[in-house]
Amino acid sequence: MSAIESVMQEHRVFNPPASFAKTAAIPSMEAYQALCDEAAKDYEGFWARHARELLHWHKPFTKVLDESNAPFYKWFEDGEINASYNCLDRNVEKGLGDKTAIVFEADDGTVTRVSYQELLAKVSRFANGMKALGIKKGDRVVIYMPMSVEGVVAMQACARIGATHSVVFGGFSAKSLQERLVDVGAVALITADEQMRGGKALPLKAIADEALTLGGCEAVKNVIVYRRTGGNVAWTEGRDRSMEDVAAGQSDNCPAEPVGAEHPLFVLYTSGSTGKPKGVQHSTGGYLLWALMTMRWTFDIKPDDMFWCTADIGWVTGHTYITYGPLAAGATQIVFEGVPTFPNAGRFWDMIQRHKVSIFYTAPTAIRSLIKAAEADEKIHPKQYDLSSLRLLGTVGEPINPEAWMWYYKNIGRERCPIVDTFWQTETGGHMITPLPGATPLVPGSCTLPLPGIMAAIVDETGQDVPNGNGGILVVKRPWPSMIRTIWGDPERFKKSYYPEELGGKLYLAGDGSIRDKETGYFTIMGRIDDVLNVSGHRMGTMEIESALVSNPIVAEAAVVGRPDDTTGEAICAFVVLKRSRPTAEEAVKIAAELRNWVGKEIGPIAKPKDIRFGDNLPKTRSGKIMRRLLRSLAKGEDITQDTSTLENPAILDQLKQAQ
C-alpha cells in the first residue's frame, strides 16, 4: 500500500483534549470557522486588524493590500516597522527583560541562558559594529554559521540596521556558498571558525575561504568570524575580523532602523527544478505578522512555555520558528547545536526531560530514525524519560506517515498531546495547512485544514476546482501577507514558477499534489509534482544533483530520481553512464563512493545519492528523451509496466537494477 493510500484509508480520529481547548487561542471548530468567515467577508480588514493588534509600527500603515502589479503583491506598503524591535525592545519595554529568551545547549551538553535584555544588548553591540564597518540599510549579508546564540544575533542585527540577510546552511559546500554570495550580491560574510556536530569539529571558515576564491565575490569586503572552537584558521588581514572584535567597545544602544513593510528582511535559497537555486525574497511586515500569528494559533504559545524547534537557522523553519516567531511572541526557547543521536539517540528525550520542554517541533525524518534507535536499544526508549512537561507536538518539512504519527503520539505525547502536522514552504513564510491544537480533530497523516485567511484549494491542470476525493494540484487563491515577494533578481522566474499562465496567472502554485477527504475536507499532501526531491525535509532539485555528477570528469551522463525511504522519506537514486566502460563488482562500489563524495563537495552532504547505478547508457525514447518514469520504477524495485517498445536499448534495464 502506498503512503497516500494508507492516509486515505485512515479513519482514526483524535479529538483535542478538553483541558487543552479550555485555554487555547482558538478553542473550538466554531471559533476557527468564525475567523475563516471574517477573512472571507472582509479579507483586507481581517489582516489589517491582526497587523495593528500584534505588531509595533514605527509609522502606521494606511494601505493594506496592493494588487495593482499582480502577482507582485504588496502588504502594508506605506507602514514602517523593524523586525528586531518587535522581537527584542518591545519585550523589554513590556517588562520581560529578565525573562530567558534562549536556552542554548551546545553539542557537548553545556547550557547557556540568555535573557531578553542580554540578547538585545548583544544584538545592539554587534549591529553597531557592523555599522562601523560600513554595512548599512539595503546591503546584503550572507550568514554561514552553526546553530548558536551568535547565529540568531547575526540575523537580528541585520534586521536591526535594515540589512537583508541570506543564511546558508552550514552543511553546504564552498561552491553552493559561492553561488549564493554572488547571486545575492553580498557585501559581508558572517561565519565561524568551525562547528561542532556529534563530537566532531567541522570546518566552516575554511569552506568560506574557498568559496571566496571561486570568483565573483569581490563585493565581499568583510568576513566576520565567530570563534566557536578556537581552532586554527587562515586569516586575511584587513578582511577578516572576529565577531567579538566587531562588537567590542560598541554601545549597548543601537536604535532600530525603521524600514518599509515591503523591505526585504531576508533572501533564502531553495532548490528549483531547473538546477539554479532560487533566492526566495521575504518582506518585513507581512512575514513577521504571520510568524507571530502562527506562534499563537498553531503552537498556542503561552508565557510559561518552553518551546523547542529542532530545525537549523539555515532553513526557513529556523528563521520563522527560532529567530523571529518565538522572540516576537516573547517566548522562551531552546536553541540546540548538536544532532539527535549524540552522545546517544536518547538526546532529544533527555533534553525534553531536563529543560521541561512543553512544545516540541521536529521533522518526520528525525522521528523515524529515533523510532529505529528506540526499538533497537531499550535504554534510550522514550519510556525511560519523564516527558510529562510536554503539552503539544509538531512535525515539519515533509508529510508524516500514519505509523510514525501514531508512534510519536503514543510514545512521546503519551496520548495526551495534540500533534500539529504543519504543511508550509520556504515560499509561504509560515504555516499554511495545519491542525489547531485546541480545535481540530486529528487524523494521522493529514495536515487537516488551512489556517484562517489562507484560501487553499485543489485544482486540475487548467486551474478548475476538483471535487473532494479527487487528487489535484495544491494552490492558494488569494495572496497572504507572509508570501514570497519575488525570486531575487529574477521576476520572470518567479511568475513562471509560482503564478503560471497555465493556471490563469492568478493562483499560487505550491508545487505539491494534494487530495481532500470526501467527508471532512481534510487535506493530505501527496508529494512534489515537479522534479524536486524531499530528503529529510530538505528540498533538492534533481537537475542540481545531475549537474554536479556530470561535472565529474569521468561521468558522461546522469539522471537522478527519488525513491521512498523508511528514514529520510525520500532517498536519492542516481543512474550514471561513465565516459569509459561500465564498472562492475568492487570497481563499481569504489567509483560510487567517489561520486558520492564528489556530490557532497559540489552541493553538500545532504545531496549525496543513497544508491548509484551504472549503465552503458540511460533508457531513452527514440527521440532521445530520458524515460524518467521508467527510472523511478527501477529505483523502487517495481516491475516494469511501462511501454518499453520505444526504448533504444532494452538490455540496459538489467544493468540499472544493480544498486551500489
From Swiss-Prot:
MF GO annotations: acetate-CoA ligase activity; AMP binding; ATP binding; metal ion binding
Binding site for Mg(2+): 550, 555
Modified residues (N6-acetyllysine): 625
UniProt binding sites for CoA: 197-200, 317, 536
UniProt KW keywords: Acetylation, ATP-binding, Ligase, Magnesium, Metal-binding, Nucleotide-binding
Transmembrane segments: none
GO BP terms in the entry: acetyl-CoA biosynthetic process from acetate
Presence of keyword Chaperone: no
Residue positions binding ATP: 397-399, 421-426, 512, 528, 539
Gene Ontology cellular-component annotations: cytosol
Enzyme Commission number(s) of this protein: 6.2.1.1
UniProt cofactor(s): Mg(2+)
SUPFAM superfamilies per record: Acetyl-CoA synthetase-like
Catalytic activity: acetate + ATP + CoA = acetyl-CoA + AMP + diphosphate
Domain of life: Bacteria
Pfam families documented for this protein: ACAS_N, AMP-binding, AMP-binding_C
Protein role: Catalyzes the conversion of acetate into acetyl-CoA (AcCoA), an essential intermediate at the junction of anabolic and catabolic pathways. AcsA undergoes a two-step reaction. In the first half reaction, AcsA combines acetate with ATP to form acetyl-adenylate (AcAMP) intermediate. In the second half reaction, it can then transfer the acetyl group from AcAMP to the sulfhydryl group of CoA, forming the product AcCoA.
Matching HAMAP family: Ac_CoA_synth
Family to which this protein belongs: Belongs to the ATP-dependent AMP-binding enzyme family.
Name used for this protein in its record: Acetyl-coenzyme A synthetase
Protein species of origin: Cupriavidus metallidurans (strain ATCC 43123 / DSM 2839 / NBRC 102507 / CH34)
